[in-house]
Amino acid sequence: MAVGKNKRLTKGGKKGAKKKIVDPFSKKDWYDVKAPAMFNIRNLGKTLVTRTQGTKIASDGLKGRVFEVSLADLQNDEVAFRKFKLITEDVQGKNCLTNFHGMDLTRDKMCSMVKKWQTMIEAHVDVKTTDGYLLRLFCVGFTKKRNNQVRKTSYAQHQQVRQIRKKMMEIMTREVQTNDLKEVVNKLIPDSVGKDIEKACQSIYPLHDVYVRKVKMLKKPKFELGKLMELHGEGGAGGAAKASGDDTGAKVERADGYEPPIQETV
């Protein structure tokens, strides 16, 4: 075969020489994720986003991003089976300001509670907070042996199950309906709702392991920057610095479409 006739060899050589390896991380920026003021630890971590290029704005790629965080990390606590979902609602500088988006229990906690010889009682209810957030709350509880009981099973009768379920729904509705989202989250952190249900149902059938196992966000009111700033302790500067023990920058009080005025002289 004549020299220079092998097209595949020459083609491959040219292509290999031209190809440049571009590091994808060179086009990206790191943003800090900030939790609302209800939690002790405000610095959740960092998130990555592609830099602003033409009409594609970086902050638009961050808005609506959901972070799932263990309550132990948010409260510097030992109780790690409760997970909170936080959604990015606004970006101020290099900070992503988040808001409550849901709550869940870990799979291993749920599985550890389900056992033989007891009745599992579940209830769910859709409730609206005073500030217009529509939440769906799921509750779970388990029957337990009475103090002087000899029999190994502790099954509740169907009528008792219905009474307990009714009580669960009543308490969940009452606790959410009369409060705004901030107060509801403050009740979910120690799960005071579950303790109230356990106490109220004691007369029907003794319960244990009563938890609000899940909270879903169904509807939100129209986004207001002022309300988000309130949740973050007026711009998320002073409160965050105290809670996380590091400097998080100055107070931010700019509107969403803010543009600095044009200066005559530089």
UniProtKB/Swiss-Prot annotation:
GO terms under cellular component: cytosol; cytosolic small ribosomal subunit
Recorded GO MF terms: structural constituent of ribosome
Subcellular location: Cytoplasm
Record GO biological process: chordate embryonic development; translation
Chief place where the protein resides: cytoplasm
Short name of one Pfam family: Ribosomal_S3Ae
Role, per record: Component of the small ribosomal subunit. The ribosome is a large ribonucleoprotein complex responsible for the synthesis of proteins in the cell.
HAMAP family: Ribosomal_eS1_euk (MF_03122)
Subunit architecture: Component of the small ribosomal subunit. Mature ribosomes consist of a small (40S) and a large (60S) subunit. The 40S subunit contains about 33 different proteins and 1 molecule of RNA (18S). The 60S subunit contains about 49 different proteins and 3 molecules of RNA (28S, 5.8S and 5S).
Family indicated by similarity: Belongs to the eukaryotic ribosomal protein eS1 family.
Protein name: Small ribosomal subunit protein eS1
